[in-house]
């Protein structure tokens, strides 16, 4: 139930008690800051610059402007994104690969391995809607290659029944999965693969599993 009530809060008086810092301590702290900056900048310098991105795009038959934003946003994960696009080019799926990348957040671009993206790209009907079916992400879960797993594990008869009537998938999730809210701490979920294997989930993981299964079946 929702409710509200007035609260009158008086914040405590500020009484900061900062320690004295000697000139030598300040100098050492500055040295450490500079060292940290140099390490970070050296790492950033390994990211592909615009000419390298343009050359990569040409090598896979794509327009530089189409891939530059994704590669820049992927930062230290650029090799994985480029590998994904390279594989898509070999299979003639560059346009579809870009549609998939467009569904991802910048954090996903920085975190997701090429193999996970490939699993979703190559195991989804080419005519399926990108935002509602091709997209790997459901909520705030870690992205996994659940699509090929569920397509392989869900019995053919069940898959056919779920496609004919998606409400049967709803009923299966309700009746076949045991709710175990104590399994997940705040902001963690069970992967769709884990839910299938264990037949147990908290409510959010069950919801994610349902969407993952529906997408895997092309619903």
Spans of model-derived segments:
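A conserved hydrophobic secondary-structure block that centers on an alpha-helix together
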Residues: 197-207, 213
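Hydrophobic transmembrane alpha-helix bundles
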Residues: 210, 218-219
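Short Gly/charged-rich anion-binding patches and loops
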Residues: 168, 208-209
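N-terminal accessory/pre-domain segments preceding catalytic cores
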Residues: 1-182, 189-197, 215-217
């Amino acid at each position: 139930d929702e409710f509200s009530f007035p609260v009158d809060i008086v914040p405590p008086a500020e009484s900061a008690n900062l320690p004295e810092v000697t000139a030598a301590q300040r100098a050492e702290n500055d040295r450490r800051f500079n060292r940290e900056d140099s390490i970070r900048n050296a790492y950033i310098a390994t990211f592909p610059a615009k000419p390298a991105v343009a050359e990569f795009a040409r090598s896979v038959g794509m327009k530089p402007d189409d891939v530059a934003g994704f590669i820049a946003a992927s930062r230290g994960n650029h090799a994985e994104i480029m590998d994904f696009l390279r594989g898509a080019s070999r299979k003639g799926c560059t346009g579809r690969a870009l549609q998939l990348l467009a569904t991802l957040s910048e954090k996903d671009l920085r975190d997701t391995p090429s193999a996970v993206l490939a699993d979703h790209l190559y195991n989804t009907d080419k005519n399926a809607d990108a935002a509602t079916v091709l997209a790997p992400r459901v909520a705030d879960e870690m992205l996994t290659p659940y699509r090929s797993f569920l397509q392989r594990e869900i019995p053919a008869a069940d898959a056919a029944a779920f496609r004919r009537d998606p409400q049967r998938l709803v009923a299966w999730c309700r009746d076949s999965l045991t709710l175990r809210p104590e399994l997940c701490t705040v902001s963690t979920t069970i992967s769709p693969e884990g839910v299938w294997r264990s037949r147990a989930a908290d409510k959010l993981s069950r919801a994610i599993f349902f969407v993952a299964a529906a997408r895997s079946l092309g619903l």
